[in-house]
């Protein structure tokens, strides 16, 4: 389980294959944790005695002391969970793995080897939510996802093409020169939301390129809730074109940390 403002729970068979995944949101970490566990057991007609062990990760894991309902409970540090989960879902041997959650963390991960924290940033989903409420009055993630789809970036961002008739060095006309520097008077809430999403995703993209240069790789695995934003693929594709970095958003990327915690605990447990 990955416990933050919501709990993501993943059940695995002994061979590491996934049984199911679900997400439960509640007012506090313990309520979401026990709600997620109860929901999962009921959905799959399982008993507590059917569980070999429970692996916890995420900041909310600190609220749990001892075993849960008498089931052996293991706490796994979040960074190894992110690294193992990102590699498992992407089927890569090594990569920079990015966790795009409330904030952003960038890790270097090697399968069966080193997993280390490269750097982190306070820019992430929390930034998007806070600025979104300030600027548009919307902070719910589902509404942010919906609203940004209809936005027009040309109403918000200044591009190379706005300032030059051609390329500037290797930068094409559509590349962003300055976020929010072209804010139009008639910009809609959707336009502003699209600009906010672009600001956050581009900041993460820039950090990931620098992390790749540091680690000597060109492979980035993206995980976390922000991977579900509709413009994510388009934004990171531009980074691929500009810097030759391969961005992978694997299936079930939002559950990467929970999956990684389960796999890591099974590996450490022998």
Residue positions per predicted region:
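Glycine-rich phosphate-binding loop of actin/hexokinase-like ATP-binding domains
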Residues: 21-22, 75-81, 85-142
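Conserved phosphate-binding/catalytic loops in two-lobed NTP-binding clefts
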Residues: 72-79, 237-259
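Glycine-rich phosphate-binding/hydrolytic loop that grips phosphoryl groups
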Residues: 83-89, 128-132, 247-270
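Short beta-strand scaffold segments in enzyme catalytic cores
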Residues: 7-13, 104-109
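Glycine-rich phosphate-binding loops at beta-strand->alpha-helix junctions
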Residues: 56-64, 210-213, 217-239, 254
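Active-site rim beta-loop-alpha module in soluble metabolic enzymes
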Residues: 133-211
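Short beta-strand-loop/turn "lid" adjacent to the catalytic site in phosphate-handling enzymes
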Residues: 22-26, 42-78, 115-117
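Conserved small/polar residues in nucleotide/adenosyl-binding loops
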Residues: 1-5
């Amino acid at each position: 389980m990955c416990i933050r403002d919501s709990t993501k729970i993943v059940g695995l068979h002994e061979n590491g294959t996934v049984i199911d995944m679900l997400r439960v949101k509640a007012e506090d970490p313990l309520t979401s944790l026990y709600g997620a566990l109860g929901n999962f057991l009921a959905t799959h007609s399982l008993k507590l005695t059917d569980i070999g062990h429970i692996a916890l990760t995420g900041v909310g894991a600190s609220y749990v002391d001892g075993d849960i309902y008498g089931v052996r409970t293991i706490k796994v540090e979040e960074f190894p969970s992110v690294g193992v989960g990102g590699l498992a879902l992407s089927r890569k041997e090594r990569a920079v793995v990015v966790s795009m959650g409330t904030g952003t963390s960038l890790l270097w991960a090697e399968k069966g080897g080193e997993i280390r924290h490269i750097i982190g940033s306070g820019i992430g989903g929390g930034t998007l939510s806070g600025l979104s409420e300030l600027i548009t009055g919307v902070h719910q993630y589902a509404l942010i996802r919906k609203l940004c789809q209809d936005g027009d970036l040309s109403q918000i961002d200044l591009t190379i093409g706005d300032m030059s008739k051609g390329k500037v060095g290797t930068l094409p006309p559509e590349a962003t020169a300055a976020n929010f520097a072209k804010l139009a008077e008639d910009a809609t809430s959707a336009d502003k939301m699209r600009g906010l999403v672009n600001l956050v995703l581009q900041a993460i993209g820039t950090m990931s390129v620098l992390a790749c240069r540091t680690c000597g790789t060109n492979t980035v695995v993206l995980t976390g809730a922000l991977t579900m934003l509709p413009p994510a693929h388009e934004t990171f594709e531009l980074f691929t074109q500009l810097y030759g970095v391969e961005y992978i958003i694997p299936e079930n990327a939002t559950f990467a940390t929970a999956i990684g915690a389960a796999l890591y605990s099974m590996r450490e447990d022998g």
